[in-house]
Amino acid sequence: MALGAAYHHYLQLAGDHGTATHALLLGVLIFLVIRLVSARRTGTTSANKRKQQQRLPLPPWPPGKLPIIGHLHLIGAETHISIRDLDAKHGRNGLLLLRIGAVPTLFVSSPSAADAVLRTQDHIFASRPPWMAAEIIRYGPSDVAFVPYGEYGRQGRKLLTTHMLSTKKVQSFRHGRQEEVRLVMDKIRAAATAAPPAAVDLSDLLSGYTNDVVSRAVLGASHRNQGRNRLFSELTEINVSLLAGFNLEDYFPPNMAMADVLLRLVSVKARRLNQRWNDVFDELIQEHVQSRPSGESEESEADFIHVLLSIQQEYGLTTDNLKAILVDMFEAGIETSYLTLEYGMAELINNRHVMEKLQTEVRTTMGSPDGKKLDMLAEEDLGSMPYLKATIKETLRLHPPAPFLLPHYSTADSEIDGYFVPAGTRVLVHAWALGRDRTTWEKPEEFMPERFVQEPGAVDVHMKGKDLRFIPFGSGRRICPGMNFGFATMEVMLANLMYHFDWEVPGSGAGVSMEESFGLTLRRKEKLLLVPRIAS
């Protein structure tokens, strides 16, 4: 029935009910007509937009694509450097498209392109691609970092930012962090007072420190019981190795013989690892259920497991959801803080003038009237140390723990800077290249914390994702929610290392190697061995 005929039909049904009914029916009809026309226009506009996008060129790609493997042969062992060089030669405006196996993969290396992916069009790019190892290790995945974007992911982020990683909650763990720093200082002091002073393995000490800080936050003061902290360190190390680099099993069709073999190998390792996480979490959750505190406030040092159990019903979380979120806490919390501290100390050793300037700031700020050194710098002492904060920022600029942000995934066709990006494209934002972009940074290869000190001529860069020149923690909907926890962990340790000790390279070495090993995170190849001396 046509709209006009329908209208007259309803008028007849209304009969003599008067002008009010007539007016009501007329209003309903007008509303329906407007909705219909609007829907048609919207549909036509969307269809036209899709056609226009599809007529755009794809982002530039290098020649030499081969059957089956695509451009994989162009990527060397130092993947972050290979991609930078390919982008410089074949990319445009920070966009480079490679086909890795069967999967189109877009590499993003400029602030404007990163802004499109992470902010202006993040509703399209906020999801994650299929990642078999992550799905097994993270229960589905049902964590926060790897889960495809949707309502569960939004609620998971809300849970973390509200209950587990808020500024207030991070501050509630400060006494635990400071106790862990004190233990490390005691070990270094013992080496420094030996005759002669002995070298310490800072890689081992800093890795153990960040592991213990996170373990303590997750399960409380019992984190060293039965060697649990060492077990968490081992499991996290296996996690990172399984997720390292390009997981080729996810880039080839599963019916290919090679892909099938890779899938089987990775699946067996991932399931074995998942079972080990299961065993330890089952035990810990049961202990926490039996010892659950009553009326505990978020201002107390309630550990993460207690917090998750207290809000489990509110958020409708399964036990597997709890476990997946805890895996996130270990992997992100341990690896990133440890690597940043190690790189920071390595850069300070190689740039003595920077270390001396930082030591002067820390020691002058914390000078006491009687000339006695403090036993320990506390977190509340660090607010007036801008060069300390600048040093950590500069370390994150040159050495972001993850050279590429976790992969994004386009869920719809889109356009970036005049190029067509089809749905189903994997997108890797090149955080390492952004931090070394010569069009953005003055002397980008040099370690210069001064660029972050807020003085005339300094670079005013927001670290928390608002400035796309510098995104060590990501940006937009998938920004890392643990940045406050990580920064607090790094800041108090670095301040105490600079306050209590002078540092030297063993033997006659003038500096340390910065040679790197690529993976999910970027690591130095060599252990950081340094000789401490008690600061005068």
Curated annotation (Swiss-Prot):
The keyword Zinc does not apply. GO terms for molecular function: heme binding; indolin-2-one monooxygenase activity; iron ion binding; oxidoreductase activity, acting on paired donors, with incorporation or reduction of molecular oxygen, NAD(P)H as one donor, and incorporation of one atom of oxygen. Pathway: Secondary metabolite biosynthesis; 2,4-dihydroxy-1,4-benzoxazin-3-one biosynthesis; 2,4-dihydroxy-1,4-benzoxazin-3-one from indoleglycerol phosphate: step 3/5. PROSITE patterns: CYTOCHROME_P450. The chain crosses the membrane at residues 18-34. It comes from Zea mays (Maize). Keywords: Heme, Iron, Membrane, Metal-binding, Monooxygenase, NAD, NADP, Oxidoreductase, Transmembrane, Transmembrane helix. Gene3D superfamilies: Cytochrome P450. GO terms for cellular component: membrane. It is found in: Membrane. Its EC number is 1.14.14.157. Belongs to the cytochrome P450 family. It comes from the Eukaryota. Catalyzes the conversion of indolin-2-one to 3-hydroxyindolin-2-one. It is a single-pass membrane protein. This is Indolin-2-one monooxygenase. Heme binds at C480. Its cofactor is heme. The keyword Oxidoreductase applies. It catalyses: indolin-2-one + reduced [NADPH--hemoprotein reductase] + O2 = 3-hydroxyindolin-2-one + oxidized [NADPH--hemoprotein reductase] + H2O + H(+).
